[in-house]
Swiss-Prot record:
Keywords: NADP, Oxidoreductase. Prefers NADP to NAD. InterPro entries: NAD(P)-bd_dom_sf, Sc_DH/Rdtase_CS, SDR_fam. Substrate binds at S145. It catalyses: D-glucose + NAD(+) = D-glucono-1,5-lactone + NADH + H(+); D-glucose + NADP(+) = D-glucono-1,5-lactone + NADPH + H(+). The keyword Acyltransferase does not apply. Homotetramer. NADP(+) binds at residues 11-35. The gene is gdhII. Signal peptide: none annotated. Belongs to the short-chain dehydrogenases/reductases (SDR) family. The active site is at Y158 (proton acceptor). CDD domains: GlcDH_SDR_c. It comes from Priestia megaterium (Bacillus megaterium). This is Glucose 1-dehydrogenase 2.
Length: 261
């Protein structure tokens, strides 16, 4: 646990399920004030709010689509209005779907880029704007992937969004480091989340993925949440502009680098 995270105001986009849910709950355990963003499922968001409060934190839920500029502006404004400040912005909302690249529609391409990359930019921009205007040494954490560096056949739109996120984060980190604002990525590998549920329910597919992970198992959402808590804490005060891969060594495995996945 990180005592300096108590009462910090943390926004988590896509916070009602998967990695977002795990991170939101973890910050609740840190007794932070958590803003849970969700796009459509209010019931799930309310469940996360309850978990956060039971863990000792405070929480509100805010509906919004990260691809819409006005929704992201409202998200940050609501965090400040309800909790008085903003300390940590976690741009987690993301989508993916497999499509052969020659069959990928522009609509599908735009959906993934707009959610994964543009949404993260908007969240970063609004948070940094608040930090600069209020002289806050704030923290932005973007949810990237091992695929910011490794190609992924059938997922060209997803890989492009995460590759773009890598340089976006590095650029923002360099630009705002003089103001004490830190910007980092988390790069998860294979994690047991709802987005992967169907794939990992198949014993053969699960075993195939596990064979590409040197540590031999598929990660848990809570393991990614631990990375987020570290990056948000003062223990990472000298860390900015990096992608912290939490992948069980997957990015170092030769067969994965050759294009499996």
């Amino acid at each position: 646990m990180y005592t300096d995270l108590k009462d910090k105001v943390v926004v988590v986009t896509g916070g009602s399920k998967g990695l977002g849910r795990a991170m939101a709950v973890r910050f609740g355990q840190e007794q932070s004030k958590v803003v849970v963003n969700y796009r459509s499922n209010e019931e799930e968001a309310l469940e996360v709010k309850k978990e956060i409060e039971e863990a000792g934190g405070q929480a509100i839920i805010v509906r919004g689509d990260v691809t819409k500029e006005e929704d992201v502006v409202n998200l940050v404004e609501t965090a400040v209005k309800e909790f008085g400040s903003l300390d940590v912005m976690i741009n987690n909302a993301g989508v993916e779907n497999p499509v052969p690249s020659h069959e990928l529609s522009l609509e599908n391409w735009n959906q993934v880029i707009d959610t994964n990359l543009t949404g993260a930019f908007l969240g970063s921009r609004e948070a940094i704007k608040y930090f600069v205007e209020n002289d806050i040494k704030g923290n932005v954490i973007n949810m990237s992937s091992v695929h910011e560096m490794i190609p992924w056949p059938l997922f060209v739109h997803y890989a492009a969004s995460k590759g773009g996120m890598k340089l976006m984060t590095e650029t923002l980190a360099l630009e705002y480091a003089p103001k004490g604002i830190r910007v980092n990525n988390i790069g998860p590998g294979a994690i047991d989340t709802p987005i992967n549920a169907e794939k990992f329910a198949d014993p053969e597919q699960r075993a195939d993925v596990e064979s590409m992970i040197p540590m031999g198992y598929i990660g848990k959402p809570e393991e990614i949440a631990s990375v987020a808590a570290f990056l948000a804490s003062s223990q990472a005060s000298y860390v900015t502009g990096i992608t912290l891969f939490a992948d069980g060594g997957m990015t170092k495995y030769p067969s994965f680098q050759a294009g499996r996945g």
